[in-house]
């Protein structure tokens, strides 16, 4: 994790968060709900908690386990799966927790996100820094892509379109140091779990936030991402200067655990392409995204193999 030299920081931090979520989910079911507002708050907190637990286990599974493979998921080990608030202790065991298989972990992630969608159907308010129905739907679509369940991915993502908007880079104000892509007014942003680090850690100038000259040169000259996100300098790498705010102040919008509309379009295109029977729909979503990124873009037709 950035900002720490301790290799266990991410592991410890995420399990601490999961422990709080487990307690929250158990306690809110003991509440005596009387008013409509109390019921709405209950569903909002439940939906947010389930979304976050699913998100955190997805991160843990990908950081510390193998990539999901449907053929081996029932035997591939991931991380310990803890979904209760109690403290277990068995004096006869050398270790209190064992690694769960990937199929069990992903099944729990799927269950949490589906349950969060149900909760959000009773409390639909959307705030950038809070989980929402749109955030849960997009994250679950990503999970289904990991699981190679293309039809499920397509079906869960489809209701998003019409309720999300792409940010156009081919019209309007040019991005600059005073007008960054990642900001609270960008309608493309669906969810941002803002950074806990001061913004100085996320300036986009550090070496780990640079892209190679080779990658930079792959962008077409009409692709606005080439100039909007990157500053061209006389080195072998380029800083993502116009994507992040710079300066030493508390972070707000951050791409750490961010969800935005562009991913929905890419994920939908991937799901349709991988189905092998819906190339037309895959092209539709990919072309719509690129029309908002490349000046004078002409729609392309690709096959699933491409």
Question: Language-model features: where?
Answer:
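TPR-repeat structural position
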Residues: 106, 150, 278-279
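Short coil/linker segments at helix-helix boundaries
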Residues: 40, 63-107
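Short glycine/proline-rich turn/loop motifs
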Residues: 1-5, 88-95, 238-253
